Amino acid sequence: MARAINSAYRSFINSSATDDRRTRMNAPRSLSALSTTANPALSTLVEQVCALIAPNWPLDRMIAVSPYWKRIDKPFAQAAAELKQLAASPMTMTLSDYHLRWQNKQIQSADLQQAIAEQNSDLSESTLIAALQQPTAPSHPWPLLCDTVDSRRDLEHHPAWNDAITHQISQFCAAYFDHHQADWSPDQQTGLFATWREAMIHDRSITLLLNETSVKQKATKLPEDAMAAIEQTLAQLAIAPAQQETYLQAVLMRISGWASWCAYLAWQAGFEGRHDEHLRDLLAIRLCWENLLDDGERGMGSVWLQWQQSWAPRQSCEEDRALRIALLWQRSAEIAYQRQLFAALTSAQESAPQSSYPEVQAAFCIDVRSEVIRRHLEAQSPHIQTLGFAGFFGLPIRYQLLGTEASRPQLPGLLAPSLIVSDSTGNEDQDAKLALRRRARLKRHFSWRAFHHLPASTFTLVETTGLAYLTKLLKRTLSYPALSASVERFAFTEHEWQSVKPQFTRDPQTLAQRAQMAANILRALGIATEQARLVLLVGHGSQTQNNPQRAGLDCGACCGQSGEVNARTLAALLNDQAVRQALPEYGISLRDDVHFIAALHNTTTEAMRLFDRHEIPTSHREALEQLDQQLTAASHGARQERAPSLELNHNHQAPPSKDNALSAQQLEQAFLRRAHDWAQTRPEWGLTNNAAFIIAPRQRSKQAKLDGRVFLHEYQPERDPEGQLLTQIMTAPMLVTHWINMQYFASTVDNRRFGSGNKTLHNVVGGNIGLFEGNGGDLRCGLALQSLHDGQGWRHEALRLTVVIDAPRERIEQVMASHRVVEHLVKHEWLYLARFADQGIEIYLQGTWQRITQPSSDSSAR
């Protein structure tokens, strides 16, 4: 890849190592400058505890994050045992979920036997089956002092301290970090902990709510320094050094949502070379609540002694039989999926026809939602070739909105942008005039919005503006244009928007640098030596209303934004005649008649839009007309495939039958209505049910129906003898797919802690920080239940990612040996690694490659 791209990947790869070179992936530099008032050993311990918290991005940049990311240096089973002990957080589905799959024969006896053999378990198949009928004992988190206090409290008439503490910290953090919604926020000059301490001294709400007068007085005795407060509390509660790490982890897990937000702030600070201590301060705040609840009594019958005694049965992470059973069922479910996936891929290799010379090439994002429409587009003609590539198309860019100071990253959240693009007409004077007009419109709009947010505006807005505003409300409710207004188009007229397109700003980007970037992107796309006359660069975005988590449905590789900017920027770069003339210096010659077209795949409605059509040469118009028809047909096919999961495949006024199936136009309108329905909690299923990642030529999987469960990345092993491209894929896109997979996994198995609960109860916090479920509790991270469950059952099956690569063993093993983060993911079973081998599949288990023997010829991966 180009140096600019390669450096971005390299910065990610270097920061991924879990060895002594700890950087922003595992222990952000921003946590290294701890207070000098604490002893060095405690400072190191606090840093290690804080480093276990994965970051959570804000709503407007919502990308998938694995909440387990900082624990991958331990085996999956060990992490599961620790989280169960610390936070009563499960890392498997429930036994009732496995029971349903067993009854439906999704999990078969052979799957159970294989799981038992892999783990060398002493548990028998009959024991596992019998466990499905037995009640599961509830899990409890590592007890804090507040739990023991609550055990002696009349909770029918008084609120629990545990809940009240979470609520107080959460409300304080919401006000402290809010820069958008609140009319007032606490002073941030003294830091999070010191500001909280000051608030506790003067805030009477806790005293009134909980009828506890001593809290305010005790708060005055807390040290002003966070590390000093941590040290004092550990000493006061007599936490032995051997227990401190576990105890501090348990404390921080009680406020894990805000901890993830603070970890994000530390992550961003690390990118900028700054120090950030918010996460340490948050730990100090939650720990000091234990201090405030301590009555000082230490004798027989005291709260403190009862609390200490409750630790006794929890002193070690010994084998938990119930957990072992659950983990074996989890592995059996994964084996069941792998059995079907591997059969489908083996069958696809046997039936794959010879590829023909492409007339159209279409590069899509690796997103699982692309698999469905790619398959339907390929079905339109044997001369259409589709490719898979990370949706930011290798451009490490930040997008600057014309006429504003607003900008946003358009690349994976793991990376830092190094280039800037902005909208331009190609004429500086016109750009300046356009920016001026846009700023004036924005000023008027936001002055009007300020009125919206006045306290009384809820009651006076319609009365003040009369029928004019009522008409606007009705239009927004009843109309559904094919493309909703986006941030990029906001405050532009349609004519103005059509006159601009994203372009690189004037910076040190020389022609040579742009040409080298273009050459290496073409190589990574796999079209350096062969191009069709028309090459589509297809970004993707979603279309929903009244959805604060909308960014989670957009392109994760573009940091939760639409991929339009990246696709249009790359198309402009590759169509630039000066760049094309310079490409031979980098070993690439494009055919003279190739034209690159930017496109956008609307994943909610399955619509496909082509951009900058006026720039397409007249010599390509006939081919373009044919392509339009093929795209329309592919969109309809994708809608038909998705319709049953959305209950849109029939006229609901009559029983389902062939006679009342919706026409193509009716189906399109049904999808549009759903996209514009303010009350729709499930506009689309996003990446629900993702389960695998294939790194191989499309020909390897083209004949397999993968049901939108598989990420697809183009890789041609014969063109990568040194393994450089495979290294980039396994250390960047593969890790991103792992994050996505684990976000969906965690939100399913533990939605209370790693999901965001009921979407209908969501309230936005701080403009874009995150969500509350209702008006309090911890900050909610991850996916809402409605994104995973249809009201009857789970739409997402929580399975660890299966990665299938078309490459020699030695090349794959070299990547693992060179990059510890990859080695940890594979050898600690956070994902599974397999490879194509001689018309079959082999999988890497317990350090060896094992040939897969297929008992079935089933050709669909369900």
Swiss-Prot record:
One Pfam family from the record: DabA
Compartment(s) where it occurs, according to its Swiss-Prot or TrEMBL record: Cell inner membrane
Highest taxon, organism lineage: Bacteria
Disulfide bonds: none
Claim: Membrane is one of the keywords in the record: yes
Keyword field: Cell inner membrane, Cell membrane, Membrane, Metal-binding, Transport, Zinc
Membrane topology (UniProt): Peripheral membrane protein
Cofactor(s) for this UniProt protein: Zn(2+)
GO CC terms in record: plasma membrane
Keyword Metal-binding: yes
GO-annotated molecular function: zinc ion binding
InterPro entries: DabA (IPR018752)
Subunit note: Forms a complex with DabB.
Family (UniProt): Belongs to the inorganic carbon transporter (TC 9.A.2) DabA family.
Name under which the protein is recorded: Probable inorganic carbon transporter subunit DabA
